[in-house]
Amino acid sequence: MMLPLPTPRALLIAAGALVVAGLLGAGGWYWHTVAARHAMAAYADAMTRAQPALGPQATAETRAAGIRELEAALTQYPSGPGAAEVAYQLGNLRYEAQQYAQARGAWELAVAQGAPQTLRVLSLSGVAYAWEAERNYAKAVDAFKVALTGLGPKDFYYEELLLGLGRAQELAGQKADATATYRRALSELTHSRRLEEIRARLAALGA
């Protein structure tokens, strides 16, 4: 069985608390300027209004309303403190709505806005998942490689990204590369709970 693609809900759950904490932290750093206060107020208001869209039972209409709220805040303050967090959450909502190109755009904006390391990794992983969801596996492979740049086995989300790379390589027909990636995972992720999955993928590849 192919290693599973994370669901949109899993992406949201992975960083819900992180986004709120990051937004509040950004406010502490930038609160000394009037423009920053206005930006933070707009972001906080938009995030509050968008909360119903983040729930597991959100309807398409609720999600669309949340997207509008976050986009309006980013349009008004495209580079204020906390913009990366808002853009990341916008990407999640776009992904949930299966608007994959727009989701990538939002996550790329989060990275461009100087997202902190954890949020940056999540945003880059989202770009890869969006390509994968569109079945553009070659692009997904490239995106996973970008997301893995500079990371090691002890870093946040490294395991998910490395296994995502292997999965995308399989789906792209890059059998030799996928085999190498899974072997790398076995050697680097020695305490992973997914070792049997990895071995199963190698066996399926004839390795």
Model-derived features: where do they sit?
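Structural signature of alpha-solenoid helical repeat junctions
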Residues: 37, 42, 62, 78, ...
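Short solvent-exposed coil/turn linkers within tandem alpha-helical repeat scaffolds
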Residues: 74-83, 97, 113-120, 148-157, ...
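N-terminal positive-inside, membrane-proximal cytosolic segments immediately preceding the first
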Residues: 1-20
